Amino acid sequence: MKKTALLLAALLLFLTFPGRAGADYDPEVDYLSIMVRAAACGDIEAGRAAEICRNEKIDRTGSDEVKIAFEDLFLLAKIITSEAGSERLSDEWRMCVGEVVLNRVASPEFPDTVKEVIMQEGQYEGVNTDEFLYYLNPTEASVDAALRLLLGERLMEPQVVFQANFPQGGGVYARYYDSLYGYTYFCSSSNPELYW
């Protein structure tokens, strides 16, 4: 944790006092790794600063890397932690939780941003609490799952937009069982024609 804090402090110093006139990013720095570490320790300022530098680096170098908003990475990792953060649950389970959020963002049936999907009334329990909003830092496994999803990895079909402890919607696509938590079902929309 100390190492991460020092790295993030160094990034902030670099951004405040760039070594070369007009240089806003260092081509040698892996800003995505900084965003990941910032998400895992809840350092929003460092994560946003790294996002800005990474996007500028992508634009200036003509890279085909996917741009990722730090807010999306952080919020997606937080909801994955909230819904499937236990170490006893599989990476696949975590990926499915996050994928439901991204499938909803892409769906005509739900809001258009990660934040709006997560905060939509009646959808995710506890997201409007101080615990979720201010104190919950995502686990490293949840940040990894969120990153993989934002980079395009998928396990389910686009119409899988529900996650609950009971079947719902247009049918069960996948289900996971844990002896402590019981079943979690990942279910399709009742309107599959919207997804083809």
Locate predicted features.
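N-terminal secretory targeting signals
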Residues: 1-68, 196
